């Protein structure tokens, strides 16, 4: 497996895993109204997470409004992230693929900020799983910034 650059796409490492999971389409992105902005042109890069399955989080209006507002700004970039199902989580751990956004498949750790929209407390453990998959320390004191 090739190691992706810190801010580069992990799709080359993710794609071979997709035939081995249920509903792989939820991880490929490219939906109507999805936005992929120039990474280098953005001053601030947001990863917006809905910590539940793609089909639950995609229609969330709050997350989509924030996604649109941030991407309307010339200085900002926002991409979406959802919880992965256990089948892909196991493969990601086995193959060293970090948690990623569905828009450009960049690792969550490459973003400046991470926003999370919870609809229930059940999403808390999914956030912890995503942080762990991303290699982001759970405790703020253990992070660089």
Named regions from a protein language model:
Residues 1-145:
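A short, structured N-terminal alpha-helical element that caps or precedes a catalytic domain
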